Regions:
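N-terminal small/glycine-rich loop or linker at the start of catalytic domains
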Residues: 1-6, 64-76, 112-121
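Conserved beta-strand positions in the central sheet of alpha/beta enzyme cores
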Residues: 31, 65, 107, 152, ...
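A short acidic, helix-capping loop that chelates divalent metal ions and anchors anionic groups
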Residues: 36-40, 72-78, 114-119, 190-191, ...
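Glycine-rich, proline-tolerant flexible connector loops at the mouths of alpha/beta enzymes
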Residues: 33-53, 110-117
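Short, conserved active-site loops that position catalytic residues or coordinate cofactors/metal ions
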Residues: 25-36, 65-73, 110
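Active-site acidic/histidine proton-transfer and metal-coordination neighborhood
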Residues: 16-17, 55-59, 76-180, 190
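Histidine-acidic metal/acid-base catalytic patches
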Residues: 1-4, 11-28, 57, 102, ...
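Short glycine-enriched, charge-decorated loop/helix-capping segments at active-site entrances
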Residues: 39-41, 80-83, 123-124, 221-227
């Protein structure tokens, strides 16, 4: 497996600063994110995106996956048809940017019933979210296939697709090799176990986030450093070997440290080496 890290794990700075730190800490690649503004955004030109790719290439780093900070603002399941259209347009641009960066996967939040930390006033019925999300992803499927970039649906605290069996069946119903799971092992622990998700989703897993979570803490405060929480990483690794997973695993460390913020990158790299059996 290849060891990467998500860009949101880094202290504030430029993309170049983050890539340099990732390289120094021993990562093989970085998962970047599109934003509304900034160096890499929905407004970035193809030329600007290719310059980011060259920067990473020059450092010997892969840009293997692309997420987007606007996924909670523009939702495939929104009550407003105009917002659903914006969500589809955003995902199309995310696919295009991923192709330019050399990434083979984008992270997508499949739909949102409700979420406490972003627009908590919005609540959409579960069956309606299912219908709208399925419709939107079905429309996006041919575009992903034409670019050769996969859409990875993340299990996240969106009160939707709450079990690995439901995620599996949703993916299978979409019927494309270019739509699969972006499995976040830490996000599963509030109601299930990541090793079950791994074994049930199997070949449908496109990419994986490594996080850790302390169940007794609860809420967003439960997220802790790798190996400091309740994720049974030895069992997760056994499950990954069983299904033959040999793709990227990305540390996603949120929140960052308050002081000596670069230390989280080095600590995460070491913990991932231990988890992966490199040390």
């Amino acid at each position: 497996m290849k060891k990467g890290i998500n860009i949101w794990s880094f202290p504030m700075g430029t993309i170049k600063d983050s890539l340099s730190l990732a390289k120094d800490a021993g990562f093989d690649g970085v998962e970047l994110a599109l934003g509304a503004e900034g160096e890499l955004s929905l407004k970035s030109t193809d030329k600007e995106i290719l310059e980011v790719k060259k920067m990473a290439d020059d450092m010997g780093l892969s840009l293997y996956s692309l997420t987007c900070s606007l996924c909670w603002d523009y939702r495939l399941s929104d009550d407003d048809p105009a917002m659903r259209l914006k969500a589809k347009d955003m995902i199309k641009r995310q696919l295009e940017c991923a192709k330019l960066l050399g990434a083979d996967t984008i992270l997508v939040v499949p739909g949102v019933v409700n979420v406490s930390f972003s627009h908590p006033e919005k609540k959409v019925a579960y069956d309606v979210v299912y219908e709208r999300s399925f419709e939107g992803l079905s429309e996006l499927r041919p575009y992903a296939e034409s670019l050769g970039v996969s859409i990875g649906l993340e299990n996240v605290w969106n009160k939707f697709l709450l079990s690995p069996m439901e995620m599996r069946d949703f993916i299978d119903k979409l019927g494309s090799d270019y739509i699969g799971s972006y499995l976040d092992v830490g996000n599963t622990l509030y109601c299930s176990y990541p090793e079950d998700w791994v074994r049930i989703l199997g070949k449908r897993i496109k990419k994986i986030h490594f996080k850790d979570y302390r169940v007794e803490a609860g809420g967003l405060h439960g997220f802790v450093d790798l190996l400091a929480g309740d994720v049974n990483y030895p069992e997760v690794m056994r499950a990954l070997y069983e299904i033959g997973y040999d793709d990227w695993v990305s540390g996603e460390m949120i929140p960052n440290y308050k002081y000596h913020t670069d230390a989280i990158i080095y600590n995460t790299s070491y913990s991932m080496d231990r988890i992966l059996g490199r040390k």
